[in-house]
Amino acid sequence: MNIVIVQLGSLALITLAGPIIIVLLFLKQGNL
């Protein structure tokens, strides 16, 4: 059960952090 919870948690983090990371990278490229 713990493995399933960890997998779901990691998927949720990737789903939420994905767009944020893309935006941060875009802003960094824009600043450069």
Swiss-Prot record:
The keyword Cytoplasm does not apply. It is a single-pass membrane protein. GO terms for cellular component: chloroplast thylakoid membrane; photosystem II. One of its GO terms (biological process) is photosynthesis. The chain crosses the membrane at residues 3-23. It comes from the Eukaryota. InterPro entries: PSII_Ycf12_core-subunit. It is found in: Plastid, Chloroplast thylakoid membrane. Keywords: Chloroplast, Membrane, Photosynthesis, Photosystem II, Plastid, Thylakoid, Transmembrane, Transmembrane helix. PSII is composed of 1 copy each of membrane proteins PsbA, PsbB, PsbC, PsbD, PsbE, PsbF, PsbH, PsbI, PsbJ, PsbK, PsbL, PsbM, PsbT, PsbY, PsbZ, Psb30/Ycf12, peripheral proteins of the oxygen-evolving complex and a large number of cofactors. It forms dimeric complexes. A core subunit of photosystem II (PSII), probably helps stabilize the reaction center. Belongs to the Psb30/Ycf12 family. This is Photosystem II reaction center protein Psb30. It comes from Euglena viridis. The gene is psb30.
